[in-house]
């Protein structure tokens, strides 16, 4: 019996050995996956963290400018709000979009370690955006008749026209700020951008106080302060770049930057259209709401929801930047699988944050609403939109990240067509039908634009991303990098 027991124990021990090996392998694989997730998270947040800070501080320049103008009077506040949101806002989103061409080119070049191309890309972007800024000057010069044509009261339109002319220096600063911002971002020098934005904001607050309360320059003083702050930001980043901060990627000004401008313009334009179609879509939501019967309450409630949504969008837009850089870097390095992994990590983390924020907004909207209005009627209207606002925030936690994948992969033209179709041929008509034909008012307009536009666009982007052949995209990135290289341009 003893011998049989020993044999049985021996058999059991032998049977346990492969099980233990499998368990050890599984534990090792688990550990490797956790390590990979942690490493990718660190790389992602090295971009996302400073990007959130930068976006908040640059947007605060506009907010603080309006706040100082608001203390001068209702007319001044209305005029500078129109200039910031309509005149400057139109061009601001266009330049942001056009500068994302650098995220594709510089991001992939950085991954491929072809650093000599960076400086030429940056200079080409400066040239293209500067030419576009000249073409857009009539919007500032003829702001008064444009605003009157749009139905603005004469006094607001007249003052807005004067402010717009004084805002021209800010307009030109965008042509230099956004390209150099993307240039540094693709090299993971995000802390430099954040420091520059923080310094500019502090200076902006001080100069605003000086111009408005000490020198008593009025509303012109507030917009002049914005000019100082934006150009200070450009000066800091330009000095850092050209004075040794980027030794590998900046080798001085080059005549090569004047070559292949038409191809660069087409890529920049498709990037600009992709971003603008989305930005203008939400601006149209406010315009459409203004045509409802109880327009004042509806516009106020929708404006509050858009303000909350705009502040929350700083997070997914930072993930947009982080995703585009990470995907572009990995594709440029020929790592299709790692680009896919970077996309999954970014979407997952942004979605988790989006779920948390959307739930908090849903339950705390009453308290948050008091920050914007003390009117019980307006707050009740805002509360009625809580479900739509929460759902919009949830969708926005995914959609910009997928757009970042598109930018990192160079799909701007495709996404521009998707945005056009989803937003303006599906979402907008559906919003009109639900708002007016079915008498759902502002809830119908917004629901139609969310489910018909944003949701359909998000589903299409998810489908495209899931079907993507990442190894093929890595090959495409290699071809693109070689095509745009300085050495090729010289041949």
UniProtKB/Swiss-Prot annotation:
Subcellular localization(s) per the UniProt record: Membrane
Membrane topology: Multi-pass membrane protein
Major place of residence: membrane
Molecular-function annotations in GO: antiporter activity; xenobiotic transmembrane transporter activity
A GO biological process held by the record: xenobiotic detoxification by transmembrane export across the plasma membrane
Alphabetical keyword list: Membrane, Transmembrane, Transmembrane helix, Transport
GO cellular-component term (any): membrane
Heme recorded as keyword: no
Protein name: Protein DETOXIFICATION 28
Organism of derivation: Arabidopsis thaliana
């Amino acid at each position: 019996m003893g011998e049989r027991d020993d044999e049985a124990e021996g058999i059991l021990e032998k049977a346990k050995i492969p099980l233990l090996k499998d368990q050890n392998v599984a534990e090792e694989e688990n550990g490797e996956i956790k390590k990979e997730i942690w490493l990718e998270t660190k790389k992602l947040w090295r971009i996302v963290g400073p990007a959130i800070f930068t976006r908040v501080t640059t947007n605060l320049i506009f907010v603080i400018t309006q706040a100082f103008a608001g203390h001068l009077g209702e007319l001044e506040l209305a005029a500078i709000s129109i200039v910031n949101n309509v005149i400057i806002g139109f061009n601001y989103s266009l330049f942001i979009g056009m500068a994302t061409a650098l995220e594709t080119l510089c991001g992939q070049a950085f991954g491929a370690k072809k650093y000599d191309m960076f400086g030429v890309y940056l200079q080409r972007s400066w040239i293209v955006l500067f030419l576009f800024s000249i073409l857009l000057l009539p919007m500032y010069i003829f702001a008064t008749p444009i605003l009157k044509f749009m139905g603005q009261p004469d006094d607001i339109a007249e003052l807005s026209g004067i402010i717009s002319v004084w805002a021209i220096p800010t307009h030109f600063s965008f042509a230099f700020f956004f390209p150099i911002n993307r240039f540094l971002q693709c090299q993971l020098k995000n802390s430099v951008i954040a420091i520059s934005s923080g310094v500019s904001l502090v200076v902006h607050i001080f100069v605003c106080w000086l111009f408005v309360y000490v020198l008593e320059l009025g509303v012109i003083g507030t917009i002049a302060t914005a000019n100082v702050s934006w150009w200070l930001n450009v000066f800091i980043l330009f000095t850092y770049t050209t004075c040794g901060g980027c030794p590998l990627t900046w080798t001085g000004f080059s005549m090569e930057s004047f070559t292949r401008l038409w191809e660069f313009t087409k890529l920049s334009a498709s990037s600009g259209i992709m971003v603008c179609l989305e930005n203008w879509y939400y601006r149209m939501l406010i315009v459409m709401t203004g045509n409802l019967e109880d327009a004042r309450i509806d516009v106020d409630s929708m404006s509050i929801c858009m303000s909350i949504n705009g502040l929350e969008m700083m997070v997914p837009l930072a993930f947009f930047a982080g995703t585009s850089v990470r995907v572009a870097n990995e594709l440029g390095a020929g790592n299709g699988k790692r680009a896919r992994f970077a996309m999954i990590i970014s979407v997952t983390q942004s979605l988790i944050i989006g779920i948390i924020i959307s739930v908090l907004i849903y339950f705390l909207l009453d308290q948050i609403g008091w920050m914007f209005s003390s009117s019980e009627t307006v707050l009740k209207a805002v509360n009625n939109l809580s479900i739509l606002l929460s759902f919009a925030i949830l969708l926005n936690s995914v959609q910009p990240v997928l757009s970042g994948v598109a930018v990192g992969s160079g799909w701007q033209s495709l996404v521009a067509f998707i945005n056009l179709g989803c937003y303006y041929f599906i979402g907008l008509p559906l919003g009109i039908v639900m708002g007016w034909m079915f008498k759902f008012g502002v809830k119908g307009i917004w629901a139609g634009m969310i489910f018909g536009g944003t949701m359909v666009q998000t589903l299409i982007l998810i489908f495209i991303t899931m079907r993507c052949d990442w190894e093929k995209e890595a090959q495409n990135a290699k071809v693109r990098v070689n095509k745009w290289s300085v050495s090729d341009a010289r041949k």
